[in-house]
Amino acid sequence: GVLADQWKEFFYCDSMPPDVLMMKGQKRTGGRSSNTGGEDNIISNGSVIAVNNGQCMMIVDQGKIVEFSAEPGAFTYDASTEPSIFCGDFKEGVQRSFESFAKRFAFGGQNPKNQRVYYFNTKDIIGNKYGTATPVPFRVLDERAGIDMDIGLRSFGEYSYHICDPVLFYTNVCGNVEDEYRRQELDSQLKTELLTALQPAFAKIGAMGIRYSEVPAHTMELADALNEVLSKKWREKRGIEIVSFGVSSITANP
């Protein structure tokens, strides 16, 4: 009942496995607490929410974001205040996203029916394999030798990414999941878009005068080029971006 839900609770999230991108927080009541009737999706005013390193926390109220914290420590929920944000190491874009999507509801004395604490994995998501099924065009340009031609490249390797804007990630990707959201649900789409972006990214590398055989030594430039190509789909819509792009092998087809 409503009275049972007014007891303070403690929300936390254990260390998230590397394949989990978002997880619903776990509720713990004190050993002396009689809040046995508290509902899982109700957050009592004054509840404490723990945030560990490599995580950020978000409170949603009937699907709308009301609190956000990326700073490790203990966060105390105060339902009477305006929505708050503690960005931690995140860029100011998270602040703008929060201001766009956050909202405080007034319930006229009635408790909300669906509040949740979500935790996001802010560590680098590594080991994402990619491979070109067909050759990707690459421009070979050498003005001194008078060479200007296209060749096909096959490339294989791994890349890593991270969630750079959890507000966008929640709003446009995972939403109100019941328990957790795993990378496998997103992998296929990301891989397809990454391979599509390789062609314009290779074009940027080629325009810099980098030979195809030198590409493995210029993976930072390639990662920057991919982020530039993918910025609208990944960073500005989903709140994720490439951290590193590794090339384990690259071969040319004339």
How would you describe each model-predicted region?
Residues 1-254:
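N-terminal hydrophobic membrane-entry segments
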